[in-house]
Amino acid sequence: MTDCFDSKEFLKTVTSQPGVYRMYDKAGTVIYVGKAKDLKKRLTSYFRAHVASRKTETLVKNIAQIDVTVTHTETEALLLEHNYIKLYQPRYNVLLRDDKSYPLIFLSADKHPRLAIHRGAKHEKGEYFGPFPNSYAVRETLALLQKLFPVRQCENSVYRNRSRPCLQYQIGRCSGPCVPGLVSEEEYQRQVDYVRLFLSGKDQQVLTQLISRMEEASRLLHFEDAARIRDQIQAVRRVTEQQFVSGDSEDLDVIGVAFDAGLACVHVLFIRQGKVLGSRSYFPKVPAGTELSEVVQTFVGQFYLQGSQVRTLPGEILLDFTLAEKDLLASSLSELAGRKIQIQSRPRGDRARYLKLARTNASTALVTRLSQQSTIHQRMKELAKILNLDEINRMECFDISHTMGEQTVASCVVFDANGPVRSEYRRYNISGITPGDDYAAMSQVLKRRYGKALDDKKIPDVIFIDGGKGQLSQAFDVFASLNVPWDKQKPLLVGVAKGSDRKAGLETLFLAAEGEGFSLPPDSPALHLIQHIRDDSHHHAITGHRQRRSKVKNTSALELIEGVGPKRRQILLKYMGGLQPLLNASVEEIAKVPSISQALAEKIYNALKH
């Protein structure tokens, strides 16, 4: 207990109802969020003569203020607790650092339903399938579905404005519901039903229906239809034979945990309709002295409750540990999902094998992460020594990319004590400068980045500038002109110049805008760290520049082609199904567009390719 916090007086005001409490330090920062069935009883436990753990003892010493929020039920308290944890990211809570929503496959409720990748809240009417471990898995599945079932994947804006079928129809990837007469309502709906069954894991039902239709077509002597359905059957069989299918068709999330050297790894295995869709490893931030059961308990709550609007809840969750609040979590998730959600910790049979697999993956991922951290920590320590710093907790690096001065993009990448912090990587579109003036570009991005109030934790110890003394001089000038509330003297500015032939290992470092720089040995761990952050910055800048250049080029290229006016541009985009299919089209395919001659098709093709 601190001198400035009177726990006895505070506890006199606390109710015995359920609710959530927030603990603050002297600076007014939330350091811990908790919930309780009985607030008075729970908060009193913090101020006994003997507390439960060293972690709690350290927490109590830092308390300067406590706020409480009373709720109607314990379930409400649980939901509010995890929302507050997400909002405040308190130092003494276990924190799930990756809160990105999972991608899903969306089947719309339109007259002619479309398939699409989806992230975020489920506002649009339709059906959602997933979750998938990453967007690549969704795109791969959508591409596969296009080959198996010709259901449209175009945007409604394109679909509504078509009068002729697009390229996807011509290559057999879409049945063309946009143009009357190409496919019957019954046949299109049948393909949509196949998609629905396939995504629900009911492959055998799809095959049974297709086989029945093929036999019927043969009986009626419709051999072309029978051959087409036969090809579809073979394609579906090839896909289903490649997938591991359990005898159990339920939806499961399997959560395995590993812990070592103060670092925890939680590995989630996603199983839908008996198929392993994929998995993902998480490394939650764990305060010292935290029990592993608390890590699992908090992870499950944050993982499902914080992302409640965007995650697809399975019917059952298998865990590595027995949770103290298992029933409360299960009832809260069931209430959220509108159906029963079970939480199991002692599975048998296939479920036990799944849990063992998740546990093995967690251990493997943890070993890899510890190895990477050990290397990063060694390099950080070596770099701090070379730069005469006590320690380095945060570094940022800047690079500029452009082509002949056009579409200039600056990048900023961030490393902390554990390596890259990719969620904080940023790109800046540079404008209002003389084309090709890298000094002005660097000056602009530094002013935009640092010419404002910064949280103490966001002030870097080292700022690397990709370039020689000229770029570093610009950085010094910018920092000299800053009028900010934080200590602008804290960051050490370092220029990184490549050798004459730009080979790795020949970099020269500059700590001042004048005088000679110095180089590090090629095998120096500190140099390897500098190369890592510099290369990340360069890649981030050039990727952003290419995206910006491509966007400008693609939108303006059609306008620059002689003989292609607004009307022809509209016809081209409508016929091809958008700009991307047009970019991928051959001369022959472009020539099929109404009012486009062979000569003009060649001109369009060459203009878009070069």
From Swiss-Prot:
A GO MF term: excinuclease ABC activity
This protein's GO CC annotations: cytoplasm; excinuclease repair complex
Location(s), subcellular: Cytoplasm
Superkingdom, taxonomy of origin: Bacteria
GO biological process, one term: SOS response
Location of the GIY-YIG domain: 16-94
Positions of the UVR domain: 204-239
Family that this chain belongs to: Belongs to the UvrC family.
Subunit note: Interacts with UvrB in an incision complex.
HAMAP family: UvrC (MF_00203)
Protein's recorded name: UvrABC system protein C
The organism of origin for this protein: Yersinia enterocolitica serotype O:8 / biotype 1B (strain NCTC 13174 / 8081)
Gene: uvrC
